[in-house]
Regions:
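Short, extreme N-terminal segment that most often corresponds to the first beta-strand
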Residues: 1-15, 186-188, 234-240, 376
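Generic structural signal for hydrophobic core residues of well-folded globular domains
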Residues: 122, 248-249, 253, 350, ...
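Short runs of predominantly hydrophobic/aromatic residues within well-ordered alpha helices
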Residues: 105, 115, 241-242, 366
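Activity-critical C-terminal alpha-helical subdomain
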Residues: 194-330
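N-terminal extension/subdomain marker
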Residues: 1-89
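RecA-like P-loop NTPase motor core
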Residues: 62-191
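Charge-biased C-terminal accessory regions appended to nucleic-acid-, cytoskeletal NTPase
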Residues: 7, 32, 39-50, 299-377
């Protein structure tokens, strides 16, 4: 991310604030290959200002460093954030910039304890660029954090509380609170089939976010179908995070003796592993089954999706009642573990790779999620 500190900032700002901002922007931990930010300053325009001369007394190699940075910047295509007194969508005063750039980027999840494993797998396998994983580097330095919203329905409440800390700053600068948010909300869709409009509960969540003046444009089309063209909100295109687990995970589970001796688990896995329709794998409710949902009248789409199972329907409809393994390899009971806490751990396994994640993904969504996160950094 490029940050341009403009001429009027050098001419009109308090040096203490300018110096503090410069240290935030230019700081690079010794363990990192790259700094968090790139800084663009046209030294020809600012080098005669009092503030620049003062900054040089603290940073003896300032001019050489900034000229090298600026040469990279002018030959690139990145649109910078600006630190300036002029108004603009990506323009901030020094006071605003200190708050905005010093905060970590947030990935808001329904449950960060469980769901983070999925996102970390996406970052690990899709974020590597010539041996450098920028997103992982930001996590390692505390510049990118996972936030726990406390459930899907609670996301608007979480965001309202999160944004409250910007209230005074926003009022002082006549801005929306959301202008200071650096992050993305990632939400399960709970969709039951491919072209299902967003569920009323999710529409309510979006409406509440809109009521907080959070931009929800591009999440849905006019028919309430997912388009996911919003930079700060991503609703998963499959049913839930577990639907992105590669088949290799379930193949590994069924190899275990304790599973092979449990007829219910073995039967469910045998049927699941023989499903060939991607839409079935994308939208099956893995833990609960209940293939036709809770509709008073079963939608045609669900009849089409699951009506070809024959005698396998009843077994698959029971759901995958798997709660994890004990250290001795035996199965945990529902009192000892839970599907939601155990299954995300499988994203960490060595046999989960970019290739089998892409195969299960099928349309490049995981790369798009990674790209959305990366643009925030």
């Amino acid at each position: 991310m490029w940050i341009n500190i403009t001429k009027n900032t050098f001419q009109n700002s308090d040096f203490k604030g300018l110096n503090f901002l410069y240290q935030i922007i230019s700081y690079k931990p010794t363990s990192s290959i790259k700094p968090r930010y790139n800084i663009a300053i046209d030294t020809e325009k600012v080098k005669n200002s009092v503030n620049f001369q003062l900054l040089k007394t603290i940073e003896p190699s300032l001019e050489e460093f900034l000229e090298a940075e600026y040469n990279v910047y002018v030959n690139g295509t990145d649109i910078p954030y600006k630190v300036t007194s002029q108004k603009g969508n990506q323009n901030y005063t020094i006071e605003e910039a200190i708050v905005f750039f010093n905060q970590p980027v947030s990935i808001v999840l329904e449950n960060n304890k469980n769901d983070a494993s999925f996102i970390l797998a996406v970052i690990k396998h899709f974020g590597n660029d010539n041996g450098y994983n920028k997103v992982q580097d930001h996590i390692d330095n505390g510049w990118l954090v996972f936030e726990n919203a406390g459930g899907c329905a609670n996301i608007p409440n979480f965001m309202e509380g999160f944004l409250r800390k910007f209230k005074i700053l926003a009022a002082k600068n006549s801005r929306n609170l959301f202008d200071y948010f650096r992050g993305i909300m990632i939400i399960d869709s709970d969709k039951e089939y491919q072209n299902q409009p967003i569920k009323p509960a999710h529409k309510t969540i979006l409406d509440k976010l809109h009521g907080l003046l959070i931009d929800i444009s591009g999440v849905l089309d006019a028919s309430d179908l997912l388009t996911n063209q919003n930079r700060s909100i991503h609703i998963l295109e499959k049913r839930m995070m577990e639907n992105y687990l590669p088949k290799e995970v379930f193949q590994e589970i069924i190899r275990q003796n304790s599973v092979r001796s449990n007829s219910d688990l073995k039967d469910w896995l045998d049927i699941y592993l023989n499903l060939i329709a991607e839409e079935q794998l994308d939208f099956i409710n893995i833990p609960d089954g209940n293939l036709y949902g809770n509709h008073s009248t079963v939608p045609t789409e669900l009849n089409t999706l699951w009506g070809n199972l024959g005698g396998n329907f009843a077994k698959l409809n029971q759901g995958f009642k798997f709660y994890g393994f004990k250290t001795n390899g035996r199965l945990k009971s529902s009192k000892e573990g839970s599907f939601k806490s155990e299954m995300p751990n499988w994203f960490k396994k060595a046999f989960v790779t970019k290739q089998n994640l892409e195969t299960r993904d099928g349309n490049g969504e995981l790369q798009r999620v990674l790209d959305k996160i990366a643009t925030l950094l």
